[in-house]
């Protein structure tokens, strides 16, 4: 008999794998990955060919803390999207592949995407 926690975590891993198997990021068009926990949001630009993270920001980062973006809500998620777009522009990245992970494109995840679009990234 499987525990309910095992079902939940394995289902989440399967959903994330299903989304990620269709996505591939490179240095010219990296993967914009959004990870959401109960308290925080993490956003990364990832080059899958090299296996490297090009840029990252979260609600735990010093830049976010000085800006007052320490909580997981939609306003802060949009601001994180704008900031990751600025970091991407510094790396000459203007196109990305959006990776929502195991989460629905809704709420905080959608606001990160909207903020990144506002900041100048194209999906």
From Swiss-Prot:
Protein name per the record: Large ribosomal subunit protein uL18
Gene3D superfamilies to which the protein is assigned, alphabetical: 3.30.420.100
One GO molecular-function entry: structural constituent of ribosome
Record-linked InterPro entries: Ribosomal_uL18_bac-type, Ribosomal_uL18_bac/euk
Assigned keywords, A-Z: Ribonucleoprotein, Ribosomal protein, RNA-binding, rRNA-binding
CDD domains for this protein: Ribosomal_L18_L5e
Gene Ontology CC terms: cytosolic large ribosomal subunit
Subunit structure: Part of the 50S ribosomal subunit; part of the 5S rRNA/L5/L18/L25 subcomplex. Contacts the 5S and 23S rRNAs.
NCBIfam families per UniProt: L18_bact
Disulphide bonds in the chain: none
Entry function: This is one of the proteins that bind and probably mediate the attachment of the 5S RNA into the large ribosomal subunit, where it forms part of the central protuberance.
UniProt entry tagged with the keyword Transferase: no
KW Transmembrane helix (keyword) present: no
Family to which the UniProt record says this protein belongs: Belongs to the universal ribosomal protein uL18 family.
One Gene Ontology biological process: translation
């Amino acid at each position: 008999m499987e525990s309910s926690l095992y079902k939940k975590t394995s289902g989440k891993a399967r959903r994330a794998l299903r989304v990620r198997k269709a996505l591939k990021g490179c240095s010219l068009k990296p993967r914009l990955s959004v990870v959401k926990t109960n308290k925080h949001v993490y956003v990364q630009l990832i080059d899958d060919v090299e296996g490297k993270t090009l840029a990252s920001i979260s609600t735990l980062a010093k830049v976010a803390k000085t800006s007052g973006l320490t909580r997981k809500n939609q306003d802060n998620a949009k601001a994180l999207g704008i900031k990751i777009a600025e970091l991407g522009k510094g790396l000459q990245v203007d196109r990305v592949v959006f990776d929502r992970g195991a989460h629905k494109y809704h709420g905080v995840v959608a606001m990160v995407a909207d903020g990144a679009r506002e900041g100048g990234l194209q999906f």
